[in-house]
């Protein structure tokens, strides 16, 4: 009681552009504890570790903390053996982790979004040296989320945006 445990549901450290497939242990642990010892009021707290330069030793890191997840949300009983219950909790965990991390379908798209963020900073006359990692993250997160929504709903518009950013880069 009144303690925390840390679980990294990706199961490994990586430098990929997006979240890896999550392991189900966090859901099974939470549901199992509630089932055997509950009700405990357990919460799963998504935490994002967002590095300034993943490949650089001792680069800056922003630790983003998401909204606590109730593994029993809308359900009276926990069942750690139920695939449906585990998948439901894992869906919430994945959504929570994605809300506090940057996720790009590819490194090319990551570079595009980072370039768009730099153009935004320049247009707003923001000095990247003075911007906090939290400010940089917020801008990139908003751009990445908007990019992914637009890519899904209007791929032609995304193609035009990519061409415009690439055209601007060619002019430089």
Task: State each model region's role.
Residues 1-172:
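Non-catalytic C-terminal accessory region of glycerolipid acyltransferases
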């Amino acid at each position: 009681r009144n303690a925390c445990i840390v679980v990294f549901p990706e199961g490994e450290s990586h430098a990929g552009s997006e979240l890896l497939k999550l392991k189900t242990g966090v859901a099974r642990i939470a549901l199992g504890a509630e089932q055997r010892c509950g009700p405990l009021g357990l919460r799963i707290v998504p935490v994002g570790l967002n590095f300034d330069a993943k490949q650089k030793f001792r680069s800056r890191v922003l630790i983003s903390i998401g909204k606590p997840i109730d593994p029993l949300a809308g359900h009276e009983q926990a069942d750690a053996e139920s695939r449906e219950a585990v998948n439901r909790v894992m869906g919430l965990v994945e959504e929570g982790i994605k809300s506090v991390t940057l996720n790009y379908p590819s490194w090319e798209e990551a570079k595009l979004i980072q370039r768009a963020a730099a153009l935004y900073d320049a247009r707003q006359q923001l000095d990247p040296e003075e911007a906090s990692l939290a400010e940089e993250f917020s801008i990139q997160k908003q751009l990445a989320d908007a990019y992914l929504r637009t890519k899904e709903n209007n791929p032609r518009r995304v193609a035009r945006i990519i061409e415009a950013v690439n055209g601007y880069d060619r002019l430089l």
